[in-house]
Design a protein with these regions (language model features):
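Lipid-exposed faces of alpha-helical membrane segments in multi-pass integral membrane proteins
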Residues: 15-22, 45, 49-52, 89, ...
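Alpha-helical membrane segments and adjacent membrane-interface helices in multi-pass membrane proteins
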Residues: 54-117
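Conserved active-site and cofactor/substrate-binding residues in soluble primary-metabolism enzymes
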Residues: 39-43, 47, 68-69, 115, ...
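Hydrophobic alpha-helical transmembrane segments
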Residues: 14-15, 40-45, 69, 84-88, ...
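Alpha-helical membrane-inserting segments
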Residues: 53, 57, 93, 97, ...
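Glycine-rich ThDP/TPP pyrophosphate-binding loop and its adjacent helix/strand module
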Residues: 139-144, 163, 168-176
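Hydrophobic transmembrane alpha-helices
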Residues: 2-6, 10-16, 20-73
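Short helix-perturbing small/polar motifs within transmembrane alpha-helices
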Residues: 113-158
Length: 176
């Protein structure tokens, strides 16, 4: 789901890069209340786990592959702000060391996967917890619902970005 370099024009990538920087700054500020000396190692381990599971790709269709996102899991484990930071670190490492995504698209990917996907999963998770029966399985079920919902929501953000500044030849209706 990483957007590669050259798929979205530079003005659009720059605008969403600025939004990603702003969102990351908010996450940094808010993470101070979510993470302390006791929970900081969990945030780091969560980032490592997300990185590891994202290295496992599975075929989707016609020469493409997918992998787990991890934002919803991180959100449940360490809170939304720390999760956003963990996913941002993972995306940065993947872009810099593995060319997964790309540097000019890093802001787009951070916006979609670290901010939109995590925020969406947080809102869906909180809503699901409120409406599900209060049982042992409510939290894992709410987390699964949140993870499931976060993927099309972040994909919709990409579709909006593609509609604004897509360089590809595919029409937006095909992308969405």
């Amino acid at each position: 789901m990483h957007i590669p370099d050259g798929f979205i024009d530079i003005p659009t990538a720059s605008a969403f890069g600025l939004l990603a920087v702003a969102g990351t700054a908010v996450a940094l500020k808010r993470a101070k209340s979510e993470v302390d000396d006791r929970t900081a190692p969990m945030a780091g381990l969560t980032a490592v786990f997300i990185f590891a599971v994202q290295m496992l790709n599975f075929p989707v269709a016609a020469g493409t592959s997918g992998h787990l996102l991890g934002g919803a899991l991180a959100m449940v484990l360490v809170g939304p702000s720390a999760a956003s930071l963990a996913v941002t670190v993972v995306l940065g490492v993947q872009a810099l060391l593995f060319a997964d995504g790309g540097l000019t698209a890093l802001g787009l990917n951070v916006f979609n996967l670290s901010i939109i996907a995590v925020l969406a999963s947080f809102l869906v998770f909180k809503g699901a917890v409120k409406i599900l029966p209060k049982t042992k399985s409510a939290i894992p079920l709410a987390a699964g619902i949140a993870a499931f919902a976060s993927v099309p929501i972040s994909a919709t953000a990409f579709t909006l970005q593609y509609a604004i500044g897509g360089i590809g030849t595919a029409p937006v209706s095909t992308v969405f």
